[in-house]
Design a protein with these regions (language model features):
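Sec-dependent signal peptide recognition
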Residues: 2-8
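Generic anion/oxyanion-binding catalytic loop in active/binding sites
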Residues: 8, 22, 38
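N-terminal signal peptide c-region/cleavage motif recognized by signal peptidases
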Residues: 11-16
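Cleaved targeting-peptide boundary
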Residues: 17-26
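Short solvent-exposed beta->alpha transition segments
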Residues: 21, 31-36, 46-93
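Exposed beta-sheet edge and beta->alpha loop/turn motif
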Residues: 85-154
Length: 154
């Protein structure tokens, strides 16, 4: 079953004047998980950000955290998510565009795709409970502007 979802634009940019964005940890939908991931990054809560990934889907924690050493904040734009059901789980692919504001005052734009898996909660009967998790993420640097970049999982 494929289910197209509405395109969502999320600005998670935290300005110096307003401080860190409000805390968001929402695992209700695949889109919310990706938004929560970047909320954690904007708040420098890297362990929380890392926790949205399935075991083995992200680099070890030290490498993951150090990958954001030069990041001041990020902006996220989600494309249209597509979900497919399979034997007790739903896999959702979400295209993204990210603008990373760096500590030296420059920025970089990345395009890519996250794949998330939701195991049907009604079939989970042994700890630990598995919420929606990121099973894969692929980002590449883009030469397009944040506004012009087209989110795609192709």
């Amino acid at each position: 079953m494929k289910r197209p979802l509405i395109v969502t634009l999320v600005s998670l940019h935290a300005s110096v004047a307003t401080g860190a964005p409000d805390y968001m940890d929402d695992r209700s939908s695949a889109e919310d998980v990706v938004q929560s991931l970047y909320n954690a990054i904007n708040r420098s809560e890297y362990l929380r950000a890392w926790s949205y990934f399935q075991s083995g889907a992200a680099p070890n924690y030290a490498d993951f955290k150090s990958g954001y050493n030069d990041t001041r904040s990020v902006e996220l734009r989600l494309g249209q998510a597509v979900s497919e059901g399979a034997a007790g789980s739903i896999e959702t692919r979400i295209p993204v565009v990210i603008r990373s504001h760096l500590t030296d005052g420059t920025h970089a734009v990345f395009e890519g795709c996250y794949t998330l898996v939701q195991v049907d909660p009604s079939v989970q009967d042994a700890p630990p409970f598995r919420p929606i998790q990121i099973s894969a993420g692929h980002l590449k640097k883009s030469s397009s502007s944040f506004e012009a970049a087209a989110p795609s999982c192709d």
